């Protein structure tokens, strides 16, 4: 396929719209979107969407690219717990080199590009006196920029106050260029340390004009309630749109009375949430007998309350999650199941949880299929969101700045009965 800039995308479907559409591109931007009267023939510098669905690129709002591709190195996480994952990572972290981090991150980034992801927020462990992973990922951010916008979270994996020089390392990471301040209050030694760590996180974000993304209450303990501190600080400082609480799996175990009071604060604060269905359903509930908790935050209730929430991977092939190919439709598929969002409308709108909601979480400004926006989009060989999710379709094309950066030829399956018949899994 030619790498020339496209002028038009034809025969496209758009979410919530009837018929076929053509999208005009100029200088890497969407210049106009017009309805078609019927199927149009392909012309030079046009791309045939083949009556597929055109949507903005997938967004990965939460991944750890510094740990990716390390599952089983040197040991596997046998218990499947978050805490053994941290132990296994500590073993692997001792073997880190600059080139090792870059090679593994690039391998997964290529998978993400192939899967239609063009915006990524990665957490990078800064509980390391040398900041090896951070320095490597800052280089990767510049190298991958033509294909992916990469945000880097300075993530204090072993705590801000509970790790030697944790606060100083976190601040140094921001000085070096990390985009987002991270925290992990539930992993600090005490509740008091956890609360204090959040105050320090907000102070650093204000000092360096950074976003905030907290690993928050990623535990089955119903007494882990640091999300209320995150929301209260965000509300007090007027920073809600710039603040994200990731995981909040303990919310799965909160009692109804407390949750009702909490949701009032969450709505007032305007903070964002990221759930990571594949990893949450794998790591949580490990200390339960039966019944076992699903351990995923209250996504359905957040959606009903108008609170911004999205889905991420968290991990791909590392000590916390031994599987994964960086496919966002797999994340969405699991998320809709475990959150019981299985009505037709909920499924059809589900793509928002890995596109528009995630873009809002990352504070992306130039995003969406609209005239004037950058010509960044993907084409799915599907009629609508429901069809895309049910059939788990590949990304037919990923377009960035008006150029195709990835394409996938759809597989064709044939069954040989009385007569050969192609199977497309459509009704």
From Swiss-Prot:
Description of pH dependence: Activity is lost under pH 5 but not affected up to pH 10.
Cofactor binding comment, as recorded: The purified enzyme contains a mixture of Fe(2+) and Zn(2+) bound in the active site, and a single equivalent of metal is required for full catalytic activity. After removal of the metal, the reconstitution of the enzyme with Fe(2+) gives the highest activity, followed by Mn(2+), and, to a much lesser extent, Co(2+) and Zn(2+).
Family to which the UniProt record says this protein belongs: Belongs to the metallo-dependent hydrolases superfamily. Cytosine deaminase family.
Residues carrying the site annotation Activates the nucleophilic water: 247
Regulation: Fe(2+)-CDase is rapidly inactivated by H(2)O(2), whereas Mn(2+)-CDase, Co(2+)-CDase, and Zn(2+)-CDase are not inactivated by H(2)O(2). CDase is also inhibited by excess divalent cations. Phosphonocytosine, a mimic of the tetrahedral reaction intermediate, inhibits the deamination of cytosine with a Ki of 52 nM.
Subunit structure: Homohexamer.
Gene3D superfamilies, per the entry: Metal-dependent hydrolases (3.20.20.140), Urease, subunit C, domain 1 (2.30.40.10)
EC number: 3.5.4.1, 3.5.4.-
Amino acids binding Fe(2+): 62, 64, 215, 314
Entry protein name: Cytosine deaminase
Effect recorded for residue 314 to A: 17-fold decrease in catalytic efficiency with cytosine as substrate and 2-fold increase in that with 5FC as substrate. Shows increased sensitivity to 5FC
Biotechnology: Cytosine deaminase is being explored for use as a suicide gene for cancer gene therapy. The cytosine deaminase/5-fluorouracil combined therapy has been used successfully for a variety of animal tumor models and is currently under investigation for the treatment of human cancers.
């Amino acid at each position: 396929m030619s790498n020339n800039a496209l002028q038009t995308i034809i025969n496209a479907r758009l979410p919530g719209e009837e018929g076929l559409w053509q999208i005009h591109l100029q200088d890497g931007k969407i210049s106009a979107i017009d309805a078609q009267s019927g199927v149009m023939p392909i012309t030079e510098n046009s791309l045939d969407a083949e009556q597929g669905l055109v949507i903005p690129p997938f967004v990965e709002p939460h991944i750890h690219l510094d740990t990716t591709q390390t599952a089983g190195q040197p040991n596997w996480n046998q218990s499947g717990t978050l805490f053994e994952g941290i132990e296994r990572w500590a073993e692997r972290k001792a073997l880190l080199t600059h080139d090792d981090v870059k090679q593994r991150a690039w391998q997964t980034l290529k998978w993400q590009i192939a899967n239609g992801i063009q915006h990524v927020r990665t957490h990078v462990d800064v509980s390391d006196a040398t900041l090896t992973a951070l320095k490597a990922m800052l280089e990767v951010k510049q190298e991958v920029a033509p294909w992916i916008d990469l945000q880097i979270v300075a993530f204090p994996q072993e705590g801000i106050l509970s790790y030697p020089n944790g606060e100083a390392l976190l601040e140094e990471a921001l000085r070096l260029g990390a985009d987002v301040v991270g925290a992990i209050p539930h992993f600090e030694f005490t509740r008091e340390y956890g609360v204090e760590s959040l105050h320090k996180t907000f102070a650093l974000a204000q000092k360096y004009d950074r976003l905030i993304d907290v690993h928050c209450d990623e535990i089955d303990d119903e007494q882990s309630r640091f999300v209320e501190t995150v929301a209260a600080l965000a509300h007090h400082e007027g920073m809600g749109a710039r603040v994200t609480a990731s995981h909040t799996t303990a919310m799965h175990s909160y009692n109804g009375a407390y949750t009702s009071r909490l949701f009032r604060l969450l709505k007032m604060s305007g903070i964002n949430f990221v759930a990571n269905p594949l990893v949450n359903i794998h790591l949580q509930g490990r200390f339960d007998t039966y019944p076992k908790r699903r351990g995923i935050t209250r996504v359905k209730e957040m959606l009903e309350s108008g609170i911004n929430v999205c889905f991420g991977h968290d991990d791909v092939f590392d000590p916390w999650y031994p599987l994964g190919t960086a496919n966002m439709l797999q994340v969405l598929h699991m998320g809709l199941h475990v959150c019981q969002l299985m009505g037709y409308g909920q499924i059809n709108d589900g793509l928002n949880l890995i596109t528009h909601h995630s873009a809002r979480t990352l504070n992306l400004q130039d995003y969406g299929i609209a005239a004037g926006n950058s010509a960044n989009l993907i084409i799915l060989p599907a009629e609508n969101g429901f069809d895309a999710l049910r059939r788990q379709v590949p990304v037919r094309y990923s377009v960035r700045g008006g150029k195709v950066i990835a394409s996938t030829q759809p597989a064709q399956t044939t069954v040989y009965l009385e007569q050969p018949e192609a199977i497309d899994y459509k009704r």
